[in-house]
């Protein structure tokens, strides 16, 4: 049986507030579940969605992927874990044509001995400037 102390949820100070009623991270025993994370900043702007010369936002999969994984690392560190504790990654891409660029950045953080991974194409994410969202499961014994 999981005790109350082993089943905690947390919103992380300095990170964008979730766009719904859920925590950034939830502990269940020795496992940590990080909710779907994007490149959204606390001020509701997005890394990797800066405007081009015409003023239109141009989503950049590499910048967004790097920021998403950095946000996940910060969330994990807030509960005493790190990216090395991640055992499963599920990534959601709006455009599978971005897969190679996403994969390149992903490899900056994880190698072939890293977590199990699934990458899924989705029709859209909660904001039109977002092109990637990632959720992870980490194993960090109490």
Swiss-Prot record:
Gene Ontology MF annotations: 2-aminomuconate deaminase activity
The keyword Hydrolase is annotated on this UniProt entry: yes
Thermal characteristics: Stable up to 55 degrees Celsius.
Protein origin, superkingdom: Bacteria
GO terms under cellular component: cytosol
pH dependence, entry free text: Optimum pH is 7.0. Stable in the range of pH 5.5-8.0.
Keywords from the UniProt entry: Aromatic hydrocarbons catabolism, Hydrolase
Catalytic reactions on record: (2Z,4E)-2-aminomuconate + H2O = (3E)-2-oxohex-3-enedioate + NH4(+)
GO BP field: catabolic process
Catalytic activity, EC: 3.5.99.5
Xref: Pfam families: Ribonuc_L-PSP
Activity regulation behaviour: Slightly inhibited by Pb(2+), Hg(+) and Cu(2+).
Job of this protein: Involved in the modified meta-cleavage pathway for the 2-aminophenol catabolism. Only active toward 2-aminomuconic acid.
Family: Belongs to the 2-aminomuconate deaminase family.
Name used for this protein in its record: 2-aminomuconate deaminase
Organism: Pseudomonas sp
Lineage: Bacteria, Pseudomonadati, Pseudomonadota, Gammaproteobacteria, Pseudomonadales
